[in-house]
Structure formats: C-alpha cells, structure tokens
Swiss-Prot record:
General function of this protein: Plays a role in motile cilium function, possibly by acting on outer dynein arm assembly. Seems to be important for initiation rather than maintenance of cilium motility. Required for correct positioning of cilia at the apical cell surface, suggesting an additional role in the planar cell polarity (PCP) pathway. May suppress canonical Wnt signaling activity.
Name of protein: Cilia- and flagella-associated protein 298
Gene: Cfap298
Presence of keyword Metal-binding: no
Family: Belongs to the CFAP298 family.
Statement: the UniProt record of this protein carries the keyword Cytoplasm: yes
C-alpha cells in the first residue's frame, strides 16, 4: 500500500493508504471526503463547546438583540422552551447573543465536553505523528459519537436552525464564513505531488511506480488555485534547531573575542621551540654571568 501524507499548504492534515493500482479519480474523491469530513467534525466540536456553555441557538430574528429589544418586539423563543437539556438547565448568559443561555447542568456539560475531546482526537493532526491512517469510517465514527452525545443531553432534539442540527442533517449554510473557504468540493479537488498534478484520468502507479512501500507527500488544492508551494528543503523543526545552533556558535565566538588575555602564551606548551631544545638536550639550561 502506498502511504499518502496529505497536506493543505504547509500544514499536515492526515495519513491515508491506497494500492498503487487505485484510479486517481477515486483517490482524489476519497481524500476530499476525508478532508471535508475532518473539517465538519471540527465545526461541530466548536459549536458543541458553545452548546455546553450557553445552550441552544436563538431564532435568527432574536440573535444579537438585548432583553429589552426582545420584549419590545414581543419575540418569543418557542423552540428554546421545547429543547430543554436533560436534568434541567443552568442560566449562563451568552455575551455574543447567539444562544439562549439555558446551559445543561454540570453532569450533562461534561458528557458533551468529553465526547468533543474524543472526537477531536480521532481526526487530530497528531495522528500523522503517531502514524495512524485516518479513514472515512473513523470520521463517521467521530460524527456518530457527537450525535449520540447531543441526543443524550437534548433528548427533545435541537431547533431546526441550530448549526449543530444543520450539520448533522447536512444542511449547513457556510456562506460568508471562513469555514466556507476551507471546504473543497470533491469535483473541484486536485492532488499535487512533486510539483505535478495527479491527473484524475490516470492511476497512482503511473506517478509513483509499482513499489507498494512508497511514501509520498500530496497536497490537496482547489481547482484553479494553481500549483501549491514546494516542500521546504528542511522542516520547520530542523530550521529551528539550525538557527539555535548558529546562535549558540555566535555567542561562543563573541565570548572568545572578549577574552583577549594572552598570558597563556608564556606557558611551556605555547613555546614553539620547546621540542627542538628537548632533542638537542639543552632543555632547562640557565645562563648567568661568572
């Protein structure tokens, strides 16, 4: 199996393995699915952390309004009254004004937070360092864990406009957000290796050869963005160590320049004629007038 270290720009994303005979049409779609799936997990984790702290989403027409404005406009959060957390709620005001402030109790909050940490670990970039291959099954498992935790804490479900529910139903609206710029559609995805685009009409082995033990770094890119930057000759960690070495060397040379004491030149070992006198047997001869 060929090992693919998938990157986006200079950032490591995940490891994937595929036979050399894999069609690049299929492989590109697979990489894009895992890449987008990981983004989805991270978006859900971010929103679920807010859910644990401040409760469900307010209706769009109530978001950002003060309590006085809501009373004046006679607006009512009907879904907020239905979607009550299991075990009761604790009021924690959302300063941003996106959520209703009816947070779950401490026990239910920990259920959400623990599940979020576990899901993050499954799709973490640290899996690259650990040598763990991330598959679509692992991404789905992380999503199922998150869905299960929400069902435990909110047995009555979430409002239809809550971004967590919309993510689970694949109805999320990312337009105008930074998250929208990160997503790469399967049909628009490109894989690059060694400054060459891996054409969808070919097989992986057409580029990397027949050796199934090959490991390559591929970069996923949106069509039309051009070739990604080449990999640096040395990694950022190696560059850091190199700079540290030269800094230490400079400090040592600076100290040597400051230490201009030449008294050591009077030492026996500094006498360049000592060896000659030793062989002539004239070592330690003292001359004095009679």
């Amino acid at each position: 199996m060929v090992v693919l270290h998938v990157k986006r720009g200079d950032e490591s994303q995940f490891l994937l393995q595929a036979p050399g005979s894999t069609e690049l049409e299929e492989l590109t779609a697979q990489v894009a699915r895992v890449y987008n799936g990981r983004l989805k997990v991270h978006r859900l984790c971010s929103e679920m952390e807010e859910l644990a702290e401040h409760g469900v989403f307010l209706p769009p027409n109530m978001q950002g309004l003060t309590d006085e404005q809501i009373e004046e406009l006679k607006l009512k959060d009907e879904w907020g009254e239905k979607c009550v957390p299991s075990g009761g709620s604790v009021f924690t005001k959302d300063e941003i004004g996106r959520r209703n402030g009816q947070a779950p109790n401490e026990k239910m909050k920990q259920v959400l937070k623990k599940t979020v940490e576990e899901a993050k670990a499954i799709v973490s970039k640290k899996q690259v360092e650990a040598g763990v291959f991330v598959t679509m099954e692992m991404v789905k498992d992380a999503l199922d864990q998150l869905r299960g935790a929400v069902m435990i804490v909110y047995p009555m479900g979430l409002p239809p406009y809550d971004p967590i529910r919309m993510e689970f139903e694949n109805k999320e609206d990312l337009s105008g957000t930074q998250a929208a710029l990160e997503v790469i559609q399967e049909s628009e995805a490109q894989l690059w290796w060694a400054a060459k685009e891996l054409r969808r009409t070919k097989k992986l082995s057409d580029y990397v050869g027949k050796n199934e033990k090959t490991k390559i770094i591929v970069k996923i890119q949106q069509r039309g963005q051009g070739a990604p930057a080449r990999e640096p000759v040395i990694s950022s960690e190696e560059h850091k160590q190199l700079m540290l070495f030269y800094h230490r060397r400079q400090e040592e040379l600076k100290k040597l320049e400051e230490n201009d004491d030449d008294s050591c030149l009077n030492s026996p070992w500094a006498d360049n004629t000592a060896l000659k006198r030793h062989f002539h047997g004239v070592k330690d001869i003292k001359w004095r007038p009679r």
